[in-house]
Curated annotation (Swiss-Prot):
SUPFAM superfamilies: YhbC-like, C-terminal domain, YhbC-like, N-terminal domain. Its main location: cytoplasm. It is found in: Cytoplasm. The keyword GTP-binding does not apply. PANTHER family: RIBOSOME MATURATION FACTOR RIMP. GO terms for cellular component: cytosol. It comes from Halalkalibacterium halodurans (strain ATCC BAA-125 / DSM 18197 / FERM 7344 / JCM 9153 / C-125). This is Ribosome maturation factor RimP.
Length: 156
C-alpha cells in the first residue's frame, strides 16, 4: 500500500514542481504511532524556503483531494530534505562535491565502517573523500558499491 501511495503522490506533485522550478527529492508514506504521514521533500539548485513549501502543499493537497488515492486519514508535510539530507542518488552526490559528507559502508575500509570528510570527487564508480586525522589530511577512495548510505554532514 505505501509504495503505491508514494508513486501516485510523485506523479501528482511533479507537474506542480515543474511550474515552480523545483524538483522532487523524495516521498515517504509512513505510520508513526497511530497516525499516517505523507512527506514530500522538495529541492532546487538554490534551495527551498517556507513559501515554496506552502505553495506545493496547497496545490498538492487540492490534487490529492480530487483524486483521493489514500484510504486512511493522514497528515501531509512538504519540506526541504534538511541540512543533513540523505544522498540517495548519484545526482545528489554530484551536487555535494565540495561539501562535507558522512558515509556509512557495508564493509570497513582501513578499519573504518563510517567516514566523514569533504567529498572531493564522484565519478559514478567511486567517491573520493578528504578526511582530517588530527592535524593532517588523508584522501580515501571508496567504491560506490560499498556505500550503504551517505548524507550531508554539518560541521561545527
Amino acid at each position: 500500500m505505501g509504495k503505491k501511495v508514494v508513486d501516485i503522490t510523485a506523479e501528482l506533485v511533479k507537474p506542480i514542481l515543474e511550474q515552480l522550478d523545483l524538483e522532487l527529492y523524495d516521498v515517504e508514506f509512513k505510520k508513526e504511532g497511530k497516525d499516517w504521514f505523507l512527506r514530500v521533500f522538495i529541492d532546487s539548485e538554490t534551495g527551498v524556503d517556507l513559501e515554496d513549501c506552502g505553495k506545493v502543499s496547497e496545490r498538492l493537497s487540492e490534487k490529492l483531494d480530487e483524486t483521493d488515492p489514500i484510504e486512511q486519514a493522514y497528515f501531509l508535510e512538504v519540506s526541504s530534505p534538511g541540512a543533513e539530507r540523505p544522498l540517495k542518488r548519484e545526482k545528489d552526490l554530484l551536487r555535494s562535491i565540495g561539501k562535507n559528507v558522512h558515509v556509512t559502508l557495508y564493509e570497513p575500509i582501513d578499519g573504518e565502517k563510517a567516514l566523514e570528510g569533504e567529498l572531493t570527487e564522484f565519478d559514478g564508480e567511486t567517491l573520493t573523500i578528504e578526511i582530517k586525522i588530527k592535524t593532517r589530511k588523508k584522501t580515501v577512495t571508496i567504491p560506490y558499491a560499498k556505500v550503504a548510505s551517505a548524507r550531508l554532514a554539518v560541521v561545527f
